[in-house]
Amino acid sequence: MSLLPVVMALLLTAACAYQPDAASGDGSRELTVFAAASLGNAFPEIADAFVAEHPGASVTFNFAGSQRLRTQLDFGARADVFASADRRQMDLAVEAGLIAGDPTSFAGNSLVVIVPLPGTTAELNSAVKIQRLEDLAGNGVKLALALPEVPAGRYALALLRNLEAQYPALEPGYASRVMDNVVTLEPNVRGVFQKVALGEVDAGIVYRTDAATEYAAGKVQVVSIRQ
C-alpha cells in the first residue's frame, strides 16, 4: 500500500473530524500527529504536500517510540492521528478507547544491521569491524538496540532468534551471545542510528528506512544478512 495517499487520507479524515470549537475563527485546522520515530523522515514531507493541497491547515508532529506515544495518549494527551510502528501498541490504544474508528495499515518496513561507514571517523575509531552476522556475537563488540518496550527493540530480538534458527552458519546460542554485547538500549530507533553514526557502538539494528536516507548514506552502511 502506498504511503503517501493513505497518510494523506488519514490527515484529511482528521481534519474533517476536527472539533469546531478547537478551530480558529478563520476556519484553519491545526492537526496533531503522534508518529513513531521511524517515520520522522517521511511524514513531514507528506504533511507539506497535505498543507499545500489544503490551505489553512497545519500539521504538528510528536515523534517518539510507539509505546511512549501510546502512554501519552493514555494520560490524556490529544492527537488527531496516531501512527504506531507496531500493531501491539495500536491494539492497546484501541482497547483503552483512545482510537476513533478502525486502525489502517499504511506501510511496512524491515530491520537491518548498520555499522559506521568505512573511512569515516566513527569507523576508524572502532576497534571491531563488523562484516558478517557472525561478527555480532564476537568478543568486545558493542551493540546498540532500541528498548524492548518499543517495536524496534522487540523486533530486533525476534530477528536475532529467527536468524539463529534459519542460518546454519550461526551456531546455537547466537542470539544470546549477541544480546550479551548490547551496551545501550535506546528509547527509539533514531537513538540507535545516532550511536552508530557517532561511533559510540560498533553496530546497531534499525529499520531499513532509517538506513536509506541521504543523511545515512554518508554515515553508515548496511551489513548483508545473506549467509
Language-model regions: role of each:
Residues 2-15:
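Bacterial N-terminal signal peptides
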Residues 16-54, 58-67, 71-74, 86-87, ...:
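Exported/periplasmic ABC-transporter solute-binding proteins
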Residues 77-85:
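Short, structured active-site "lid" loops
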Residues 110:
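Active-site-adjacent helical/loop segments in soluble small-molecule enzymes
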